[in-house]
């Protein structure tokens, strides 16, 4: 008479218990707002760090302030609809962000950028597409003084600015007198 379990019986019972456990395990829903807030928090910390180590001030360049590191929330084309954001330093001072100007995601090394076409691609982070990825239809920034949905720019002194000035800057003091500074 056989008084012990065979290896096959033990494996079968463990597999059955594992299967039943996964069937009745409560399903956890992914909270998109938490995911977005953690991504934005990571990106803002990285952006501020980048601005602190990358001083854009140049006394010979009257448009130096356009090169500040900036996060800008924008609307997709009307045919597409939605909202996206991009993080960039406008190196050519054109006023329009480009993939070359954008900050890289520190985790995936993808550009934190998209154009107003709002298509996902392998070079850019998918987390910038707020409407497509997270279902967000509106963003309100109380300090917005631009034509975009919202914008925050970081100076090398750690200050946050609500807009990039269009004024010519004679000196640093004149710049602070002409621009709104957020504390």
Annotated model-derived regions:
Residues 1-21, 25, 29:
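Glycine-centered recognition micro-motifs in short, flexible terminal segments and loops
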Residues 19-45, 49, 53-183:
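N-terminal helix-rich module
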